[in-house]
């Protein structure tokens, strides 16, 4: 997949971070900052999903929010996915009660 569209979208964000943001007082209530979040979201998730995540974050960042640590979510395809497995399938360990039932105790 080409990274050119992602880089084209991230370029204005980097310009803002380098030239405009240093002239403004710190205002973002989140870590990472909204501009860093937007750049990371686009690079991680692609242009469309990344911009949607960035817009959602900007709508949450206002004077009445608590703020705090809010990282970019991991890509949907990350993890221990098995080809052909359903997206909602999760592995789990048997409980002690299930083990005792299966062993006839």
From Swiss-Prot:
<keyword id="KW-1003">Cell membrane</keyword>
<protein>
    <recommendedName>
        <fullName>Putative membrane protein insertion efficiency factor</fullName>
    </recommendedName>
</protein>
<dbReference type="GO" id="GO:0005886">
    <property type="term" value="C:plasma membrane"/>
</dbReference>
<comment type="function">
    <text>Could be involved in insertion of integral membrane proteins into the membrane.</text>
</comment>
<comment type="similarity">
    <text>Belongs to the UPF0161 family.</text>
</comment>
<keyword id="KW-0472">Membrane</keyword>
<keyword id="KW-0997">Cell inner membrane</keyword>
<dbReference type="InterPro" id="IPR002696">
    <property type="entry name" value="Membr_insert_effic_factor_YidD"/>
</dbReference>
<dbReference type="Pfam" id="PF01809">
    <property type="entry name" value="YidD"/>
</dbReference>
